[in-house]
Amino acid sequence: MPWLQVRLAITPEQAETYEDALLEVGAVSVTFMDAEDQPIFEPDLGTTPLWSRTHLLALFEADTDETALLAHLALLTGGDLPEHHVEEIADQDWERSWMDNFQPMRFGRRLWIVPSWHAAPEPDAVNLLLDPGLAFGTGTHPTTALCLEWLDGQELAGRQVLDFGCGSGILAIAALLLGAERAVGTDIDPQALEASRDNASRNGIEPARFPVYLPADLPQRQADVLVANILAGPLVSLAPQLTGLVRPGGLLALSGILAEQAEEVRAAYSAHFDLDPTAEREGWIRISGRRRAD
């Protein structure tokens, strides 16, 4: 079934008004999109930031009267409509389209991330089966890729791993499949913990080998390896805590860092870690190193 799509160019201040009005006039969905390819970095917790210029996309049933719709929308919002465009678009199987675009990916020498519905390209490789049904890491983002490649290059046999900000659990599960004895995950989002549990089960990992916690419940034990793919601000503010969670001689890998933020993050850890050269991909950075003996 085709749909009538209305696209409006709005400011953040107009967002709530137009979202409410579009739903009032019968939109079956309303979506916010970046109008100018502007990234949003490190929003405050509990906020839903928007770009300075945002496109608001609304879908209506195809037989909707376009003229009446726009007139009603103008009436509800109390003035002339902002720049807008109306067109008919074909229906499509969005889930199938997304699944077709998420293909197996290789990281380093041994590790593959394989969608759970896809056959493993190399059955004898280390294959991590992933179903990113919740909006967490899949390996496609440069920061996740940098961490996965780093893990693939480490000797993890018998190691205890901490995944700080675990999301889908992709980094901890990769470490376990690459030989780690046990991993612990922590995240501020309960949905992330559920996604981690589901993905661990899909890969045959028992809960005892990969317990996950909210930060307040995280046992304060030192790990042999700590990975944290979060953001530069938290990495800097949490540096004393993260340092304390790595045993002397243990390894650290940090990502979620923009190139211009690298020096600040390195400075926050350089007092206690011998840091490796910075790794970079598409403007994102990985910082890794070994904790010095106390």
From Swiss-Prot:
One of its GO terms (cellular component) is cytosol. It comes from the Bacteria. Keywords: Cytoplasm, Methyltransferase, S-adenosyl-L-methionine, Transferase. Coiled coil: none annotated. S-adenosyl-L-methionine binds at residues 144, 165, 187, 229. GO terms for biological process: methylation. One of its GO terms (molecular function) is protein-lysine N-methyltransferase activity. The keyword Cell inner membrane does not apply. CDD domains: AdoMet_MTases. Its EC number is 2.1.1.-. It is found in: Cytoplasm. It catalyses: L-lysyl-[protein] + 3 S-adenosyl-L-methionine = N(6),N(6),N(6)-trimethyl-L-lysyl-[protein] + 3 S-adenosyl-L-homocysteine + 3 H(+). SUPFAM superfamilies: S-adenosyl-L-methionine-dependent methyltransferases. InterPro entries: Ribosomal_L11_MeTrfase_PrmA, Ribosomal_PrmA_MeTrfase, SAM-dependent_MTases_sf. Disulfide bonds: none annotated. The keyword Transmembrane helix does not apply. Methylates ribosomal protein L11. Belongs to the methyltransferase superfamily. PrmA family. This is Ribosomal protein L11 methyltransferase. It comes from Pseudomonas aeruginosa (strain ATCC 15692 / DSM 22644 / CIP 104116 / JCM 14847 / LMG 12228 / 1C / PRS 101 / PAO1). The lineage of its organism: Bacteria, Pseudomonadati, Pseudomonadota, Gammaproteobacteria, Pseudomonadales. The gene is prmA.
